[in-house]
From Swiss-Prot:
Active site residues according to the UniProt entry: 327 (charge relay system)
Xref: Pfam families: 3HBOH
Pathway: Lipid metabolism; butanoate metabolism
Natural source organism: Cupriavidus metallidurans (strain ATCC 43123 / DSM 2839 / NBRC 102507 / CH34) (Ralstonia metallidurans)
Any one of the GO CC terms: extracellular space
GO biological process assignments: butyrate metabolic process
Protein name: D-(-)-3-hydroxybutyrate oligomer hydrolase
Length: 722
């Protein structure tokens, strides 16, 4: 998909020169003094003759604008405050037809909690949270932020893209030191998926640029033919027209009506079924969100001309912009910085980013001076490996006390037997087979620190959910194609768990509660190849093995698309490679060493090497690897055993933002690449909520790391200490 109307960005590979306004410390100081001297950029200030504030041409349809008083409702907590975010979910007055206000409130509640641990014992309210101010001080307030929210679609006029962009402009926006933080949604979430990262910006009186990057939580229900609108409310497909946030299109061989008749009760999700390969455009979407936010800032705070028109007072030349977010959003921020040819972005601060290196990157990753078994694989490559082996590997004797180790039950034992029968692992017993599967994962690049996560990731169907959604996305498949015999539906009662009509209340609330990548609220993966008819994937039977083995046939089919170089899939994958060129911008990446979803050997470690190789001496990227950190802070103090093992990575995402901001504002040097050695809180494997965390559990990033903690790069070889 070609991006249109991108006046300040293009699909650059970043090898050219950047706009001369890119900040160094002196330029920042001069700009700050100049702004202060003219009294800021308020309605009576002088921002220069920059012309009228013109809405970006890529905005399609109306712009929704709402102001929040910071009491009954607000930008950060939707009026819930710090305590409300940690409490039970707010109720809908009519669960079958929640209002837009209710959906927004619950989306903020659910998405905030999905990203951070909201238990006080885990650090909420003391190390982070709405009541912890920009300087880290714990206040007695609720952390509500008054301001104005702007929301709109970007599209080419067809209504097929309809990427949501949103700007939150706090009333306290610092017009003398203007700043914007991007917070692109993580995972496949909707536009509020980056709210926990956006919190940092709001606390620093920055505007925040959000986008759902062409994904989203609410589906097209094919049975009722209803679709989500931008505010999460639902409408018939015909009634929504081009204002549908997502409406599925049929494939080449079947109409939607025909598909719905032969395959009833199915749901289409935007990331999987938009046929747009959204990931190819995540960088461009993030740049659009920043441009939209610049327009919104000017709409609220730009100088007013004599004719009453707002002026484009705030521009890339005088607004500090940091691209931030985590996971897929972090990858989008990096892509945006690589593709930014218009000088929008000044720095990057991301956590656990999904970054894919081209096959020709030539980067070598070492740990403790020894080359790792594998590095630099693409997300689809390593995830389809995980989808095959993690379920069996979770039964290794060394992992008997891992979180959810006993949850998978017979499916895990059968997966081991099926893999052994297909000569994919060795061993004549489940124990030996599990050890062989675990070895296969280590050979594929997982660090041993990730081992304890395999059982819970398998039980939660993480590998299968990502493999299915991304296979469809990369191949630009339609919902009617049922790639590898998978579909999405609400499950009936077990043990059959056949497709049924989605419960009305669950469907109505999915904009708020869903994650956009089934299994999610009341929706699961269906194995349409199950011998007795479509059935929940995890409990289904594989035709080739006649075992309930978590659908090994489906996992092999998804892997086979890569192994056979399926043309559509390979084209889509080829559109997601990063260049490594951040244009010399000050940048910090943080990631947990234990990350079992996006392994460090395939993401941040090799990206550091690629960046240093491409940029050479101009590189200003620091990589911070955190021991005892993993991908899902939201699981800590929720899944028994996580609190014992893992620290909150959100603390280090905030510290990365602090470091980049201090560098851009004050010239404070970035911390060098290093390993930060944390201390888990401890407790028992059966503890859901662990002992209270202390600051000593999460030490700061060192300005000068010890020699044994320094990460080094020589040429394109990265060496991470043990």
């Amino acid at each position: 998909m070609q991006q249109r109307h991108l006046s300040q960005s293009a699909h650059s590979h970043g090898h050219g020169t950047r706009r001369a306004h890119r900040r160094n410390t002196i330029a920042i100081a001069v700009a700050t003094l100049a702004v202060a001297a003219c009294g800021g950029f308020g309605t009576n200030g002088s921002g220069g003759n920059t012309g009228p504030n013109v809405k970006p041409a890529f905005i399609s349809g109306p712009v929704g604008v709402k102001s929040y008083d910071g009491n009954t409702d607000d930008l950060l907590t939707a009026g819930l405050g710090k305590d409300g975010l940690a409490a039970a979910a707010p109720a809908f007055a009519n669960p079958n037809a929640p209002t837009a206000v209710e959906l927004r409130r619950n989306a903020i509640w659910a998405n905030y909690r999905a990203i951070v641990d909201v238990q006080a014992a885990g650090g909420y309210g003391s190390l982070y949270g709405p009541n912890v101010d920009a300087k880290g001080n714990v206040t007695t307030g609720q952390g509500k932020v008054p301001g104005t929210e702007y929301i709109a679609f970007t599209d080419d006029g067809s209504g097929r893209q309809n990427v949501t962009v949103m700007a939150q402009v706090p009333d306290g926006f610092d017009v003398k030191h203007p700043c914007i933080i991007s917070a692109t949604s993580s995972g496949s979430r909707g536009v509020y998926g980056g709210i926990a990262v956006g919190e940092w910006g709001l606390k620093h009186n920055c505007a925040v640029a959000y986008t759902d990057k062409g994904t989203g939580a609410a589906p097209h229900d094919l049975g009722s033919d209803t679709v989500p609108l931008i505010d999460g409310t639902r409408q018939t497909r015909a009634g929504a027209g081009t204002q549908a946030q997502f409406a599925a299109q049929p494939g080449a061989s079947e109409t939607l009506a025909g598909f719905n008749s032969s395959t009833p009760h199915r749901l289409a999700f935007k990331h999987a079924h938009s046929q747009q390969n959204p990931e190819a455009n995540w960088g461009a979407n993030t740049l659009q969100a920043i441009q939209f936010t610049l327009w919104a800032v000017n709409d609220k705070f730009g100088r007013t001309n004599t004719d009453g028109m707002r002026q484009a007072t705030f521009t890339p030349a005088n607004v500090l912009v940091i691209a931030s977010a985590i996971s897929n959003g972090g990858g989008a921020a990096i892509a945006a910085a690589e593709q930014d040819t218009g000088g929008l972005i000044d720095g990057v601060a991301v956590g656990e980013p999904n970054v894919n290196l081209p096959p020709t990157a030539g980067v070598v990753v070492k740990r403790g001076g020894v080359p790792v078994a594998a590095s630099g694989k693409h997300l689809y490559d390593y995830t389809t490996i995980a989808n095959l082996y993690q379920l069996c590997a979770s039964q290794d004797a060394s992992l008997g006390n891992a979180p959810f180790a006993k949850t998978a039950g017979q499916a895990a034992l059968n997966r081991c037997a099926s893999l052994a029968a297909k000569k994919m692992i060795a061993g004549g017993s489940t124990s030996a087979q599990a050890t062989s599967a675990l070895d296969a994962l280590h050979r594929a690049g997982w660090e041993p620190e990730s081992d304890d996560l395999f059982a819970s990731l398998s039980a939660l169907e993480v590998g299968s959910s990502i493999s299915v959604t991304y296979a469809n996305a990369y191949a630009r498949a339609s919902v009617t194609d049922r790639l590898c015999h998978y579909s999405f539906s609400s499950p009936g009662s077990p043990p059959q768990a056949n497709p049924v009509t989605a419960p009305a209340a669950a469907l109505a609330g999915l904009f708020s509660t869903g994650n956009g990548i089934p299994p999610t609220t009341a929706v699961t993966l269906m194995n349409d190849a199950n011998p007795s008819g479509a059935m929940r994937d995890f409990t289904s039977i594989s035709p080739s093995t006649k075992l309930a083995d978590g659908n090994v046939d489906g996992a092999l089919c998804l892997r086979g698309l890569l192994d056979t170089r399926n043309p559509a899939l390979m084209t889509g994958i080829g559109q997601t490679y990063r260049t490594g060129n951040l244009g010399g911008r000050p940048s910090v990446i943080v990631q947990g060493r234990s990350d079992g979803l996006l392994p460090v050997n395939h993401t941040s470690r090799p990206y550091l090497g690629l960046n240093k190789h491409v940029e050479g001496a101009s590189s200003r990227l620091s990589y911070i690897e955190v021991t005892n950190g993993q991908h899902f802070d939201g699981f800590i103090d929720v899944i028994p055993g996580y609190a014992k093992r893992y620290i909150p990575m959100h603390v280090y995402v905030n510290r990365a933002l602090d470091a980049v901001y201090a560098n851009l504002r004050d010239g404070t040097p970035l911390p060098p690449s290093q390993v930060v050695r944390t201390t888990p809180r401890g407790g028992a494997d059966t503890d859901t909520v662990g002992p209270r965390i202390q600051p000593s559990n999460v030490p700061p990033i060192a300005a000068t790391p010890a020699a044994g903690d320094a990460i080094t790069v020589t040429g394109s070889t990265v060496d991470v200490p043990n």
